[in-house]
Amino acid sequence: VDIFPEHCPENPSEYLKEITVEHLLTMSCGHSTDPTHESWEVKDRSWIRFFMEHPVTHKPGTLFCYNSLGTYVLSAIVQKRTGEKLVDYLYPRLFRPLGINNVSWIESHEGINTGGWGLFLKTEDLAKMGLMLLQKGQFNGCQVVPAEWIESASSAQVPCVPAGMNSDDADKLRKVAKTSDWLQGYGYQMWRSRYNSFRADGANGQYILVIPEKNAVVVTTAHIQDMQAELNLIWKHIYPAL
């Protein structure tokens, strides 16, 4: 609300006014449903406004609900604060130090990188990202990202449930917590996984899986609906061989 007063509803709820950047990072804004897919049909107003108009049913920080539109708002915050689109801001600070040169990121109708989706990278570039994460922000001897940030981002900050569900549905899933990679906790835009690992993932099975105990990174690109099945194959066949 403080960052985008121009997009704020006329009478914002107290819960809406409480949302912080950390709530956006941890997908714990207090929404009980994800407005992302609905936003794609919105062309007559800002997606930031659409995000703010979505009902905040719980106190921020108390309910996990996977929400890519919240990540879009993070991208918008970077653009407003720096004057650069997210992809341009990251080029000299992240992509170029990792030797990643060809990056494409979809933009919204209002000229903001989508943030939570639409980033196109080669598989080997995803592996570079994973290696940097494994090495706590270092790559080729340079500290690209502060180690403290990697530690916080990859640690469980909030309890979580699979995308498409919210924490109100969590109790029925706890009995399978030991076999689910979506019940291990959520950090800053990254999931915790089994075997004390963590990951960045994209729709339909795009994974950067970081396994510190094995000093390993596993990267996949795929088109699969059952993303847990893909991870199960990694744990069954690749993990024991590491």
Q: Where do the model's predicted regions map?
A:
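Short, gly/Ser/Thr-rich active-site loops of penicillin-recognizing serine hydrolases
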Residues: Q228-L242
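Flexible, glycine-rich surface segments
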Residues: R96, N101-I150, S154
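Active-site Gly/Thr loop motif
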Residues: I100-V103, S154-V217
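Structural recognition of the beta-strand scaffold that forms the well-ordered cores
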Residues: H23-T26, C65, N102-W105, F120, ...
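Solvent-exposed loop and edge beta-strand segments that line ligand/cofactor-binding
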Residues: P12-Y15, K59-Y66, N113-F120, R199-Q206
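Active-site helix/loop module of the DD-peptidase/beta-lactamase fold
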Residues: V1-C29, E53, T82-W117, L121
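Structural helix-adjacent loops and short alpha-helical linkers that scaffold large soluble proteins
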Residues: T33-T36, Q79-Y91, G137-V145
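Alpha-helical scaffold elements that line and support the substrate/ligand-binding pocket
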Residues: L24, F64-L94, L126-L133, N215-V218
